[in-house]
């Protein structure tokens, strides 16, 4: 009898977590976390975070913003000076596989090719890819500025740009052993510039949709899916959402021109806007992405669960879940999360508190639904 009881206890310990995960998969198929890929010196502590914090919370998708923090073989000239090796990336892959976490790399394509006063690696090495070469990087960056410079873009019609960036995409997807790639594509202010010899006078929505489609089609050659931020597909003026979380340069019309199998990461940080409904109605799968306001994360999670419950079966499959976003490096986030460096100025509104609130709410909803 004692042996039978022991076997039953062991069986329960094995089955209970599986049942809990299956229930959550039905409630919210995607439960994500997005952050910059760790630097080599942060690798071990980040893997411990995966083991101790992400896995127990049933996070099943991890997006790492890699950009040039990898020792690319295809284009070593684009590597950051300090970058992850293939062996180090494989440690991340192994940790995620251990916990059935889908690992997706991100490289910013099209936009975000500069930051503040510094041009990014791609345009530094290949300046002819620049959409706006006449716009010079300032010694001291301020916003707003007379050039409308937030971040530079590469020219999507430059004949040489995709040969380079697709080499990077293929290599990073291979080393990550992934079936998806996140291309960024957010906050693209420079597109179809009037001084670009290739893009001037062209429809900006068509230019944006063309770039999304070209990236998607390239990924599809190896059965990989494209993920992207959704802000450029929202009419920022008509909705009142504004120029950051929405578009002021007419790229929003691209929503009717892009393939329907693109995954939209719909981020809203100032209000819990319910634009996930808009993307789903347009035939696109969508996840909602909070950042640093715990109350908004709770509301957005409740909304996502409600959307899935209250729509047709076809629409339900488009509301895919939630993803916490972090816009610092992995090191600063871990210091904040573990209380080593806490901002008293931010109060409760921090990414670490938002992450905890988001997954506490997912846990509660999983227990009651």
Regions found by a protein language model. Name each.
Residues 29-36, 73-76:
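Acidic/histidine-rich, surface-exposed loop or edge segments in extracytoplasmic proteins
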Residues 79-101, 207-218:
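Alpha-helix-loop-beta-strand connector modules within alpha/beta enzyme cores
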């Amino acid at each position: 009898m004692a042996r039978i009881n022991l076997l039953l206890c062991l069986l329960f310990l094995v089955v209970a977590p599986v049942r809990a995960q299956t229930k959550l998969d039905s409630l919210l198929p995607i439960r994500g976390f997005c952050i910059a890929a760790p630097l080599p010196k942060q690798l071990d502590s980040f893997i411990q975070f995966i083991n101790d914090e992400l896995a127990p919370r049933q996070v099943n998708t991890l997006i790492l913003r890699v950009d040039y923090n990898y020792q690319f073989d295809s284009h070593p000239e684009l590597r950051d000076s300090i970058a992850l090796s293939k062996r180090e990336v494989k440690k991340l892959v192994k940790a995620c596989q251990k916990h059935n976490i889908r690992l997706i790399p991100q490289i910013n394509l099209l936009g975000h090719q500069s930051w503040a006063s510094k041009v990014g690696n791609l345009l530094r090495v290949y300046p002819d890819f620049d959409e706006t070469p006449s716009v010079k990087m300032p010694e001291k960056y301020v916003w707003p500025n007379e050039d409308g410079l937030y971040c530079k873009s590469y020219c999507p019609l430059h004949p040489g740009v995709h040969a380079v960036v697709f080499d990077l995409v293929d290599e990073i997807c291979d080393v990550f052993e992934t079936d998806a790639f996140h291309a960024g594509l957010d906050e693209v202010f420079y597109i179809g510039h009037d001084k670009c010899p290739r893009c001037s006078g062209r429809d900006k929505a068509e230019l944006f949709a063309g770039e999304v489609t070209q990236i998607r089609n390239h990924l599809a050659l190896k059965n990989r899916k494209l993920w992207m931020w959704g802000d450029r597909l929202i009419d920022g003026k008509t909705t009142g959402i504004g120029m950051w979380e929405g578009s002021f340069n007419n790229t929003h019309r691209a929503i009717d021109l892009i393939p329907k199998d693109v995954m939209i990461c719909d981020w809203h940080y100032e209000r819990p806007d319910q634009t996930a409904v808009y993307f789903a109605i347009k035939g696109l799968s969508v996840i909602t992405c909070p950042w640093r306001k715990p109350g908004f994360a709770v509301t957005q999670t409740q909304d996502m669960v409600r959307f899935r419950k209250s729509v047709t079966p076809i629409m339900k499959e488009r509301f895919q879940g939630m993803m916490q976003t972090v816009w610092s490096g992995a090191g600063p986030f871990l210091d904040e999360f573990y209380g080593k460096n806490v901002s008293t100025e931010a109060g409760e509104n921090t990414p670490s508190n938002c992450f905890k609130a988001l997954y506490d709410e997912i846990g509660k909803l999983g227990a009651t639904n």
